[in-house]
Amino acid sequence: MGMLVPLISKISDLSEEAKACVAACSSVEELDEVRGRYIGRAGALTALLRQISTIQDMDERKAVGSAANAACAALKLAIQDRESQLAREQLHSRLASERIDVTLPARPRTCGKIHPISGVIREISSILSELGFAVVHGPELEDEFHVFDALNTPEHHPARAENDTFYMTKRLNGRRVVLRTHTSSMQIRAMESNPNPPIKIISPGRVYRNDWDATHSPVFHQVEGLFVDKHVTMGHLKYCINYFLSRFFARKVETRMRASFFPFTEPSAEIDVKDRHQKWVEVLGCGMVHPAVLENVNIDPEKYRGFAFGMGVERMAMLKYGITDLRNFYSNKLEWLNHYGFCFTDILGRA
């Protein structure tokens, strides 16, 4: 009994001391320090376990070993329980600090807008598709034949002057290459690919002219239409234009045709509409396809006739939505784009 009572008493004291330290820990790091101090390799309880081998009496050795092992197991369990408790407290603290106030108003959902040019092109295309027009697209870099020659625009015509048209330095098949000045070039391509009408197409797209002010831009957009078939008349053209304008401006519009001149149509006309201030405003040009244009694409003008029309997308948007400066379309001002842009849901009904 010589070493039994002092050792067991020391084990009990160390166990109670360690449990008190565990209970006082406020972090995992402090728990790790207590674990090392008592049951680590150099810990106090570990040192007592090493002394067991020096006890000669087997019964005493067994009793001390049992007490020491029980103390170590109890301390490990206390540390484990305290770790779980600290984790719960930490979680509750984090949840309390991150709590969401459900009474706060939701953040407004911001979304992009469809650019007014894209929106108006879709709007125009949708209306004309109701009349059976198919949408076609073509190259913006064209040769002189499709932009000028085939459209009955001779070499000396002012539209072909270099101060109005962007010419490239390289040639294609011996012809000069230009940035197209109108989308009428697609009408030529459509008739070339289908020499046996009917042909009923519109060609929206970007065009280029050397001009820049409040009402002109070197890059702008057009939509041009073509209908070729037997027995096509100016009456068909007038009905088509009136239907389109009434649908586009969402009201019954009063129109007038003024005689004009375009090299690719004969007769030619410009269409005016009365605005809300009862003033006549020009909106587009049109006319019957010139017989020379039909001949240039191997369509018999004695058998077929057609009409064509063209409009500037920016101009149509300015007239409909009260936009005063064409340059705003390309200024990238977010406030302006948010005001005049189309929401996706606005486009669904027009697509």
Curated annotation (Swiss-Prot):
InterPro entries: aa-tRNA-synth_II (IPR006195), aa-tRNA-synth_II/BPL/LPL (IPR045864), Phe-tRNA-synth_IIc_asu (IPR004529), Phe-tRNA_ligase_II_N (IPR004188), Phe_tRNA_ligase_alpha1_bac (IPR022911), Phenylalanyl-tRNA_Synthase (IPR002319), tRNA-bd_arm (IPR010978). SUPFAM superfamilies: Class II aaRS and biotin synthetases, tRNA-binding arm. Binds 2 magnesium ions per tetramer. Keywords: Aminoacyl-tRNA synthetase, ATP-binding, Cytoplasm, Ligase, Magnesium, Metal-binding, Nucleotide-binding, Protein biosynthesis. CDD domains: PheRS_alpha_core. Its cofactor is Mg(2+). Its EC number is 6.1.1.20. It catalyses: tRNA(Phe) + L-phenylalanine + ATP = L-phenylalanyl-tRNA(Phe) + AMP + diphosphate + H(+). Mg(2+) binds at E266. It is an enzyme of class 6 (ligase). It comes from the Bacteria. It is found in: Cytoplasm. Its main location: cytoplasm. GO terms for molecular function: ATP binding; magnesium ion binding; phenylalanine-tRNA ligase activity; tRNA binding. GO terms for biological process: phenylalanyl-tRNA aminoacylation. GO terms for cellular component: cytoplasm. PROSITE patterns: AA_TRNA_LIGASE_II (PS50862). Tetramer of two alpha and two beta subunits. Belongs to the class-II aminoacyl-tRNA synthetase family. Phe-tRNA synthetase alpha subunit type 1 subfamily. This is Phenylalanine--tRNA ligase alpha subunit.
